[in-house]
């Protein structure tokens, strides 16, 4: 009666088509290209950038809700670049079983090749490479290891800002003002998650205008009591919370005469 699927948007389309003949309800948690807006009134701007980079690299970047597009005021791009470089330098790629490793390999050769192709596209399209790049990290001559990669001065029409990379690749995009930041954040086919750092009331006001199913403010973590899911091509339905249970329930009306 219901199909629940987590995966890429491309695969989600095929699942929905396959379920259509049976008129099954379909709930899907699909891709994302989440914006991480660092507001000018953030209490510790450098720390917000630093942690945003490392959050993007979590699970080797293989997270649907990863904050892969960092939005910073154009006037503070230089400051953001320095903090991002420092964060990328802290990332240690290697055997996941080794102490001190923070990033392991990506899942497959197919994904390895896709990520490297997108990194090459970023370079070709004129994004400023400030950390990482194509190929394996030094000292790793085999395995599907990706260099933790950061691009700065990215524009939102570049391939690396449009496509879900699903790897440790961050883009830093400059914005003029709040309206510009909101427009850039919403200029994507995805709508899974969003991240905002700034003065709390200001951040909440921005969060209300971001078209995503979830927004994390000032580093707040996921909450399993809150519904998890997105808008647009990031899927439909919800996991977690009361709404997550309701996806698996049927409504029945019973009428009886006295």
Language-model segment annotations:
Residues 2-5, 193-195:
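Short catalytic-loop micro-motif centered on adjacent basic/acidic residues
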Residues 2, 8-155, 217:
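ALDH superfamily catalytic-core signature
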């Amino acid at each position: 009666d219901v199909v629940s699927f987590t995966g890429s948007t491309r695969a989600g389309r095929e699942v929905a088509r396959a379920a259509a003949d049976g008129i099954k309800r379909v709930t899907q948690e699909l891709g994302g290209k989440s914006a991480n807006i660092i507001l000018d009134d953030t209490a510790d701007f450098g720390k917000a950038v630093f942690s945003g980079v490392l959050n993007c690299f979590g699970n080797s970047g293989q997270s649907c809700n990863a904050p892969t597009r960092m939005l910073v005021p154009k006037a503070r791009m230089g400051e953001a670049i320095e903090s991002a470089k420092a964060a990328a330098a802290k990332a240690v790629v290697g055997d996941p079983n080794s102490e001190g490793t923070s990033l392991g390999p990506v899942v497959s050769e197919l994904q390895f090749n896709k990520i490297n192709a997108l990194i090459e596209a970023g370079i070709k399209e004129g994004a400023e490479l400030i950390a990482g790049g194509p190929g394996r990290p030094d000292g790793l001559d085999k395995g599907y290891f990706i260099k933790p990669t950061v691009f700065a001065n990215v524009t939102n029409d570049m391939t690396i800002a449009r496509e879900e990379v699903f790897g440790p690749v961050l883009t830093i995009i400059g914005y003029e003002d709040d309206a510009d930041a909101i427009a850039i954040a919403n200029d994507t086919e995805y709508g899974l998650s969003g991240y905002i750092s700034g003065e709390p009331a200001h951040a909440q006001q921005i969060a209300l205008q971001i078209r995503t199913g979830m927004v994390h403010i000032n580093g707040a973590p996921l909450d399993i009591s809150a519904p998890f899911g997105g808008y647009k091509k990031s899927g439909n339905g919800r996991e977690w919370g009361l709404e997550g249970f309701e996806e698996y329930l049927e409504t029945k009306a019973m009428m009886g005469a006295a």
